[in-house]
């Protein structure tokens, strides 16, 4: 445990060789799942780091609502603790946090991968729900209580805070996204919680962004297609930038209306 912004926080320090990749978990989750997804596939080229955000996993909660801006502050504090710039891979809430962190401190972020993320809460196809009673809640609360210093009795409060967050944040605009100054890969399932229109709007708004929509997949795309998702992410993190393609349109630095598309 280390102190981030005065709060005791569980961290996983970088191990191995290569650039640092910081894994940012989703809401009502913790770093364990992200480490399982990426440990074997990325550790040969990168040093993986992670931390559990306030009220998640092994990090205790504190009074007050959850806010993405505060989560980004936590992430900035963690990157400053590491003492070097890092790639970010964030899933769901972690993707929102990665985006905000990249906007706030591009000097600390090499590249950012946003998986199943949204830039505005109205981009969600359905309103997030989670039961506060019944078998599904009981199972989640049991797992939460086994890990959290706050114990199982705090589980309902965390769910309430998370649902309130999902319903009201983030509130970014495409004009905000246009200020992103680090390379970004946006990844989603073709049946994700954010609409494809919302995901594509994010892709169009972020300068130089790359987009990967994986077929036959949902918000659990990292679990459903781990090999494919990891290959795409690894290629993005290791590739030379800026991207060059045979028939650039969006990426063309100069375009003339009516220029023929190369014969492929």
Label each region the model flagged.
Residues 7-58:
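Conserved HGGG/HGGXW glycine-rich cap/lid loop of the alpha/beta-hydrolase fold
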Residues 215-264:
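Catalytic active-site module of serine/aspartate enzymes centered on a nucleophile-bearing elbow/loop
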Residues 36, 40-43, 49-89:
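Active-site loop/oxyanion-hole signature of alpha/beta-hydrolase fold enzymes
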Residues 160-176:
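Active-site nucleophile elbow and catalytic-triad environment of alpha/beta-hydrolase enzymes
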Residues 199, 203-220:
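Catalytic histidine neighborhood in serine/cysteine hydrolases
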Residues 180, 186-188:
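Short beta-strand/loop motif that positions the catalytic acidic residue
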Residues 193-198:
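Conserved alpha/beta-hydrolase "acid-adjacent" motif
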Residues 96-104, 108-142:
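Flexible "cap/lid" loop of the alpha/beta hydrolase fold
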